[in-house]
């Protein structure tokens, strides 16, 4: 796959290797240390990390890990999946993956202000990666509203996989929009210049 990307006319396309648990340096040292020992010339450009503070460790752990990766391997880093709750309420009555106890573990209140503070701190962490190797972040499913069929799986997909999944949305309290689709004020963090962080 890597050779195919490199051979295409879009030669500026960056290749990302993605792993979860972004705040857990021991996982990255084990996985990428082993991978790059076995394949020292592996052709890729960016370390992609998932980072959800309620599951993946502290912001300090994330900073240490991305600094380590950028400094040790000379590659860029990007948080390719992240989100944080703006409420512990449930917009569709099916339950959510982020619940009230996750606030304490995640380090931020599940409020619009807490969501803003999380993203602001995350941007600061990325900006502090040595040698400008921090690319940015992708906010996972900012518009996943509690609406009919607002789920990651279609009926056809569930049938194809022979799954028992009941279509639902367990992410509606981690969007950047309220349950009615109005933008939250926390979305403004995306417009602030880096020098204001």
Predicted regions and their residues:
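Feature marks short, surface-exposed loop/turn motifs that line or immediately flank catalytic pockets
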Residues: 23, 53-55, 86, 143-146
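Substrate-binding/catalytic cleft of secreted carbohydrate-active enzymes
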Residues: 51-65, 91-93
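Aromatic-rich peripheral "rim/lid" segments of glycoside hydrolase catalytic domains that contact
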Residues: 68-71, 87-133, 138-197
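A residue-level marker of the well-folded mature domains of exported/periplasmic proteins
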Residues: 7-16, 41, 89, 165
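Distinct, well-ordered alpha-helical segments
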Residues: 23-40, 58-66
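Aromatic-lined carbohydrate-recognition surfaces of secreted/lumenal glycan-active proteins
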Residues: 1-29, 76-84, 135-142
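Acidic (Asp/Glu)-rich catalytic clusters
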Residues: 6-10, 34-43, 66-72, 131
């Amino acid at each position: 796959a890597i050779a195919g990307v490199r051979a295409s006319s879009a030669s500026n396309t960056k290749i990302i290797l993605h792993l979860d648990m972004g705040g857990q340096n021991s996982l990255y040292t084990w996985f990428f240390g082993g991978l790059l020992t076995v394949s020292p010339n592996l052709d890729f450009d960016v370390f992609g990390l998932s980072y959800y503070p309620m599951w993946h460790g502290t912001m300090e752990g994330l900073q240490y890990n991305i600094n380590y990766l950028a400094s040790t391997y000379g590659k860029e880093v990007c948080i390719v999946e992240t989100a944080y709750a703006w409420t512990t309420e449930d917009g569709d009555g099916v339950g959510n993956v982020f619940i009230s106890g996750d606030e304490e573990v995640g380090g931020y209140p599940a409020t619009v202000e807490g969501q803003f503070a999380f993203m602001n701190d995350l941007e600061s962490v990325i900006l502090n990666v040595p040698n400008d190797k921090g690319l940015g972040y992708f906010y996972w499913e900012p518009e996943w509203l509690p609406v009919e069929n607002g789920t990651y799986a279609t009926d056809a997909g569930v049938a194809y996989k022979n799954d028992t999944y009941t279509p639902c949305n367990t992410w509606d309290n981690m969007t950047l929009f309220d349950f009615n689709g109005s933008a939250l004020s926390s979305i403004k963090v995306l417009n602030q210049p880096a020098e204001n962080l």
